[in-house]
């Protein structure tokens, strides 16, 4: 982009250079000696054009005219050119186009005796075949009817077309870039051969320097008669009527003025004819007009230079920014270099030093630009000061009659000096412009060097040395130009002396003195009139001063009367102030009483305001308690911060309130319809930390130690930060820990603080659901789904006692978890992760036991296949993930609408979450939100799902705490049941049943009598077995069925899929479990109960347990099979740890 900009700028500069450069052939001055004949010949050949001609030449040049085959070098060898005399006219292309001349290019060849001018003539078919502007064109004196000028020389003149060569050097067109030395030589040649000649040959009709170029008829105005000019009136009037002076070069106009001055000097009377005087005045006006146009041209050139300087400064800034780089790019590059390129730090230090060196060179270049700018501005100021000083001097000197002649001569000198100075300034501006262009090229080279600095350091050093050499050559060229300018100034001084002598003679004319005298008389009259006018004004001022004195005296009297009136008013005010003070004292007494009353009221209001926050917190607690009683799922929303490189301004989150309000903006809808408001239990901003998030869920996690079941799961689209919230980043520090680590750490800390009263045991399980398969992440068992049912892994449970144990287990589980990269997330979780924490506590004083479970679920993110760009296995994973999440949505919808049927069996995820979503558990859901605009549709679906979840009522949570009275009731119930059985058997014996039944009943009675004989031992064994059985069932991982707390649901003899008790005892692999739904014992929706009702419930429960235990211990039930939930006994591999 920068290269294209530099190219456009270079093209613009070349165009402006073509506008400002006079088209002069470079090869004309190479073979010319400094004698009078060659000087006259070069003056004849040099094309001096005015601004109008330069504009026309620009039109011709911009057409990009191709050079024809006839545009070859006009070369005459040195041997043949000694006797050749060319009498042809040289014109510029603009003049030829103005006159519609037939242009015939000639190619000089060897001469013959018959035809000394033997030329190869070829014609151009159209003006488009002309050679480039600035080349010399030979016109035939026969075919060209226009007047022509002869040129005689004994040396060969080389007029080359672009691309030709002469003398071992490559000629170039006037617009081709040249070296500083070539421009130096060109400036010397221009300053040497374009000066006016002091002799009378300047007025020679054969020289174009004294005539108007382009075929004007001004050369016919003078005719040589007896060594002087005879001015013809007809020719002068023809020149006055035509516009020939407008197109004439400045040198020709000056030559006309010099000729007229010489003619007046030669005449005796010193008078000028009226027509000649008019012509002279018109020529002077034309010169003044050109001076003004040249000054305007310099102003425009100055503005162009200023614009270019601003562009150069902007480019330098761009180069500096490219060298330094933005802060964000530096940060990203540093992070990459620290990981991948640690070995290259030393090289980077060297590169930074070189960048500093380059920055210093950029600053030096900028200083040079500023110095050149200041020098140019000083030159412009000097020129303007000179012009102002000259005009001021003319106005001052006109006032004095005696110095009028000297002033006129000085004015004439100033005019001529201005013309020369303007021409010099134009040349100097061209030189400065070329220097600036060279510096721009050097800056462009420097830009290329900075881009390739990392690859070629040595090449850059060489280029820098070349750059220094070029700057030295530029400085030498500038010094040479300054010397040339000094020489040109000396030459102009010599010319000025000759012109001053002529002007002194001209100033002796009588007409000018008469005009000066008349002007002085007129000014004297004006001065006298001014004196009379000022005297009258002085009288008027005296009258006005008298009137003002009278008015001031009247004002003084009025002020005195006003002061006396004010004194009387002050006395009255003093009297009024005393009365007001008395009234104020009375009012103050009243106000003190009222203020005391207001103070008491303010104290009451202050107390109320102080208690306001306490009331708010109490209301919030009551609201939370109400939510717990209702059993609503708590919903916490967390907004993910933007990643590096993402625009924070393009967010869908409009507002985050302090009380759970969230306003989302739809970027596709304007106005009020674009805003959508949601309300949750808590909303976390992107700036929230992990500690702030965990502080709000601490009470929920601590309730696990009180015997409650708690479930926390994270929901959201892929890449929204679910794993970060639940687990934290890879290699996280203690500050970056997620909910999993912090929850277990908090449980350990509280268990240690309560160890004097309650003894806790904590176990951890970690499984995942991958493609509808339940896999154990801690043991490495990967089971597959069979055709006839679901294969449940032996989920191993490890006891943990410290945070280090948890970190070790979590690292193993995260390594085994399925993670892959997609287009939306570099580390996308491809499975649902479930961390289950089992807590068992025993009260050391009362002996009561409590059980609590904590499920920490990290759901896989929902994703769109077209955005994630997944194929193959990743596509299959995404389909299973979306299917399970849609099943979760169906379950939430059924629970929200309180439907009679809840489809838990549609997915393994909903089966595992059944105890948390459909049971008496405390459930919390983290909603992770991606604030990017591109994820607006996924964010809205996530928020709508969370809003639906917040309305689900699960009922009040219930603690699974068993006291000592419950165990005593169970023992009493078993004793009473056995007594009833004995009495029943005795009754059957008395009724005289058949012998078969009698024997069977007697066998049973003998067994029961033996059991009754050792009743205390059997009761203890039953209670211990029941205790261990319920413990194992609570710590098992189900295959989708509810973790029911009732024993009736755990012991169902009529289930289809079952596991043999011997298999469970020996640790063999379990059989398949049917996928058919099993009945779950319905729960009561009552939140509170009386003690009597509670006792009845406990007795009914104990009777059911006693029946189950008796059935298990009876001899006829030895072959009986246990229910499917019994297959979930924790049987880990041999190397896994076990609870005793």
UniProtKB/Swiss-Prot annotation:
GO terms for biological process: microtubule-based movement; microtubule-based process. Residues 161-179 have a biased composition (Low complexity). InterPro entries: Kinesin-like_fam, Kinesin_motor_dom, Kinesin_motor_dom_sf, P-loop_NTPase. Residues 1-37, 50-81, 161-217, 323-347, 1002-1021, 1028-1140 are annotated as: Disordered. The keyword Oxidoreductase does not apply. ATP binds at residues 716-723. Keywords: ATP-binding, Coiled coil, Microtubule, Motor protein, Nucleotide-binding. Residues 1-12, 180-193, 332-347, 1066-1078 have a biased composition (Basic and acidic residues). Belongs to the TRAFAC class myosin-kinesin ATPase superfamily. Kinesin family. KIN-14 subfamily. This is Kinesin-like protein KIN-14O. It comes from Arabidopsis thaliana. The lineage of its organism: Eukaryota, Viridiplantae, Streptophyta, Embryophyta, Tracheophyta.
